[in-house]
């Protein structure tokens, strides 16, 4: 089995230079990089992660807990994290918790056993049980990004959800809609309450009475949107516009409407939230509220890297300003 000395000898450089090229820890001239990487390929050299961790007290790995990586919002956040880790020479271990406390506990134990250098927690369901688990890992540098009230344990995502709800609803109103409904997320979550607050604020400013029958609780998943769509379809008095609290629910809602012969935007207008990658390519292209998901992931991992160097690095607030992206899913009634 080839060693780092064999690579250095073949490339005509020092073992230190080989180490810097492989670990991306210092600038090395491009020509030298090519020689080293060619030697690595020729010799089929693979550095020992165990030896490196013993020598340097680092595994060059980061653990990440997310609710569900198949959710397009989290998928795009993860993309930002993974891209940063790759460029920095780190390996990302991704753990889908599904909001399950047992899985959260087991994953935390596994990541601790693998001696990850840091932990990034970005779940939509951070509750006290999870915070208690994380508090027991206080020796591990971590960034906990939370959408809830400020906590001394967590970094805060300030997503200005009230403004997002207000902007979406006002766009409906500006296009002549008064019969406006909402397909919300988990009503116990602060970000959902804030979006609904923005919805109510825009309606009140316009002097429009809110019909509570048109406000339906979803759970950010497609199945809840299908159920909501069927409820709207069954109504004798339907809204002309529906504000969905994420794009996935908006798309499932539109699909169910179309199958029932209810056309979007001709019969009902729809606005989503998040501006996921698929939104411009849906039929019709979805008007939505943009959130900078990749930048959120990149910022979170940057904060974690700072905390790996200094565990007492101050808690941070990451602010996202919602922006309306106008496409083709809202009909102008003016």
UniProtKB/Swiss-Prot annotation:
List GO molecular-function terms, semicolon-separated.
DNA-binding transcription factor activity; transcription cis-regulatory region binding
The record's PROSITE patterns line, in alphabetical order, gives: HTH_LACI_1, HTH_LACI_2
Alphabetized InterPro entries for the sequence: HTH_LacI (IPR000843), LacI/GalR-like_sensor (IPR046335), Lambda_DNA-bd_dom_sf (IPR010982), Peripla_BP_I (IPR028082), Tscrpt_reg_HTH_PurR (IPR023588)
Feature: DNA-binding region: 4-23, 48-56
Q: Which UniProt keywords apply?
A: DNA-binding, Purine biosynthesis, Repressor, Transcription, Transcription regulation
Q: Where is the signal peptide?
A: none
Transcription regulation among keywords: yes
Tagged with keyword Transcription regulation: yes
Domain of life according to the entry: Bacteria
Gene3D superfamilies on file: 3.40.50.2300, lambda repressor-like DNA-binding domains (1.10.260.40)
What is an example of a Pfam family matching this protein?
A: Peripla_BP_3
Q: Which residues form the HTH lacI-type domain?
A: 2-56
Q: Which residues bind hypoxanthine?
A: 73, 189, 191, 220, 274
For this UniProt entry, which segments traverse the membrane? none
Q: Name its GO BP terms in alphabetical order.
A: negative regulation of DNA-templated transcription; purine nucleotide biosynthetic process
Which pathway does the UniProt entry assign to this protein?
Purine metabolism; purine nucleotide biosynthesis [regulation]
Q: Which SMART domains does this one have? A: HTH_LACI
What's the entry's take on its domains? Consists of two structural and functional domains: an N-terminal DNA-binding domain, approximately the first 60 residues, and a larger C-terminal domain, approximately 280 residues, which imparts the function of corepressor binding and oligomerization.
Q: Which NCBIfam families match?
A: PRK10703.1 (NF007979)
Function as written in the Swiss-Prot or TrEMBL entry? Is the main repressor of the genes involved in the de novo synthesis of purine nucleotides, regulating purB, purC, purEK, purF, purHD, purL, purMN and guaBA expression. PurR is allosterically activated to bind its cognate DNA by binding the purine corepressors, hypoxanthine or guanine, thereby effecting transcription repression.
Q: How does it assemble?
A: Homodimer.
What is the protein name given in its UniProt record?
A: HTH-type transcriptional repressor PurR
Q: Which organism is it from?
A: Photobacterium profundum (strain SS9)
């Amino acid at each position: 089995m080839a060693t780092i000395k064999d690579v250095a000898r073949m490339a005509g450089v020092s073992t230190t230079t080989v180490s810097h090229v492989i670990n991306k820890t210092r600038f090395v001239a491009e020509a030298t990089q090519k020689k080293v990487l060619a030697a690595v390929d020729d010799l089929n050299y693979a550095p020992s992660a165990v030896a490196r961790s013993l020598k340097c007290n680092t595994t060059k790995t980061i653990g990440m807990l997310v609710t569900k990586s198949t959710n397009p919002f989290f998928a795009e956040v993860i993309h930002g994290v993974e891209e940063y880790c790759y460029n920095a020479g780190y390996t990302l271990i991704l753990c889908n918790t599904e909001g399950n406390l047992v899985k959260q506990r087991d994953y935390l134990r596994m990541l601790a056993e693998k001696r990850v250098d840091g932990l990034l927690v970005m779940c939509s369901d951070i509750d006290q049980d999870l915070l208690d688990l994380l508090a027991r890992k206080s020796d591990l540098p971590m960034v906990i990004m939370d959408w809830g009230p400020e906590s001394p344990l967590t970094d805060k995502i300030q997503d200005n959800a009230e403004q997002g709800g207000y902007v979406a609803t006002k766009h409906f109103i500006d296009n002549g809609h008064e019969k406006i409904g909402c397909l919300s997320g988990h009503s116990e979550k602060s970000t959902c309450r804030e979006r609904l607050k923005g919805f109510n604020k825009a309606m009140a400013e316009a002097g429009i009475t809110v019909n509570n029958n048109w406000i339906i609780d979803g759970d950010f998943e497609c199945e809840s949107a299908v159920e909501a769509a069927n409820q709207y379809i069954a109504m004798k008095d339907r809204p002309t516009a529906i504000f969905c609290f994420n794009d996935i629910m908006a798309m499932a809602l539109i699909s169910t409407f179309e199958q029932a012969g209810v056309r979007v935007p001709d019969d009902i207008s729809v606005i989503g939230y998040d501006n996921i990658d698929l939104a411009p390519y849906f039929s019709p292209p979805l008007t939505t509220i943009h959130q900078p998901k990749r930048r959120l992931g990149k910022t979170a991992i940057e904060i974690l890297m700072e905390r790996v160097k200094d565990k007492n690095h101050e808690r941070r607030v990451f602010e996202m300003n919602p922006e309306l992206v106008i496409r083709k899913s809202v009909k102008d009634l003016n």
